Amino acid sequence: MQENPTVWLFDLDNTLHDADAGIFTLINRAMTGYIAQRLRLSDQAASDLRQEYWHRYGATLAGLQIHHPEIDIAEFLRESHPIDEILTRLHGMPETQNTLSRLKGRKAVFSNGPSFYVRAVSDALGLTESFDALFGTDDFGLLYKPNPQAYLNVCRLLDVPPERCVMVDDSADNLHQAKALGMKTVWFGAKSHALPFIDASVSDMAQLAQYAETLSEHRQTHYNTP
């Protein structure tokens, strides 16, 4: 049996599926509409507030929790993630299932989205059986990457130290925090490149599979660096 097996932590949006193909636009519009209705703001003012909280706190809901405690969290998450419409715009990443099958160790989804959204998207992509666990923000304390406690809570749920984890994410900020906690880091996406806290930069799932084969060599790997 392998000693200290690796645990792979995967972001969801723009890592396991292409959220920029329309899903983020849909979610942002739904969030803006909800904020406008509940706080009695114009659409423009609600959009500005949504973006301000996202930039300031890492998630719109985090800002709402701080400044508008009267907001019903479950209602906000439900209204801002219209699942039926989201699934009509879902575009998975090529070679995902094949790559997941080649990764040694446990695998989990670690997303800032709500758990019902994580499960619905994973099911629709046919990926649920490839993972040992699926985590949305309400599973680890309504926290959000890059809050360090979010990572530690997920590690606790998996009963694994951060040092045994590999974080795969399209966000450099999220990976910077993962590295600070001792995780290996894989920056996923066409815009990824070499940075001091990045162990590997990959543009697609095929390159991730290649990196996984070199994991024991403890070296930086950047497939898409100019």
Annotate each language-model stretch with its function.
Residues 14, 109-112, 169:
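Conserved residues at beta->alpha junctions
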Residues 18, 109-111, 187:
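Hydrophobic residues in well-ordered beta-strands that form the structural core
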Residues 2-94, 116:
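N-terminal helical cap/lid subdomain that shapes the substrate entry/recognition surface
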Residues 75-88, 96-125, 134-137:
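Substrate-recognition element of Asp-dependent hydrolases with the DxDx(T/V) motif
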Residues 41, 70-71, 105, 127, ...:
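Short, well-ordered coil loops that connect the C-terminus of an alpha-helix to the N-terminus
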Residues 1-6, 101, 114-226:
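Asp-based, Mg2+/Mn2+-dependent phosphohydrolase catalytic module
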